[in-house]
């Protein structure tokens, strides 16, 4: 662990807030993984010059509704997201019906994992 990220008791200290999100636009890059960083939770900076940090290449090739969590036993970070893409034809395929999408659309979640919030695994579907 880098000393600047650890407090005097050897615990990780807070450096910034990480916002994991997608963009609500029906284009292939809109339904991907974006990061925002903030020191105070009010003023945010885009990561990766506003481009997606991670891409969904499997399943519906788009993701929404993220959650990020950290496992206590191994310290790894995980991003979970709904496997859903409106940009790749979900609206046409399911007649613009959220009911049809929810009943007949993908039943998967996309998952990425990281030891450090910088380097991420390949997407996998669960």
Residue ranges and their predicted role:
Residues 1-126:
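Carbohydrate-active catalytic/glycan-binding domains of CAZyme proteins
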């Amino acid at each position: 662990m880098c000393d600047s990220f650890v407090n005097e008791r050897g615990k990780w200290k807070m450096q910034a807030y990480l916002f994991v999100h997608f963009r609500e636009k029906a284009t292939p890059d809109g339904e991907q993984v974006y990061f925002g960083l903030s020191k105070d939770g009010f003023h945010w900076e885009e990561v990766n010059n506003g481009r997606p940090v991670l891409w969904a290449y499997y399943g519906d090739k788009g993701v929404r509704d993220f959650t990020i969590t950290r496992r206590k036993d191994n310290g790894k970070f995980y991003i979970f997201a709904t496997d859903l893409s409106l940009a790749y034809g979900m609206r046409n395929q399911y007649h613009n019906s959220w009911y049809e999408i929810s009943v007949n659309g993908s039943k998967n979640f996309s998952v990425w994992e990281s030891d450090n919030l910088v380097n991420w695994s390949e997407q996998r579907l669960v």
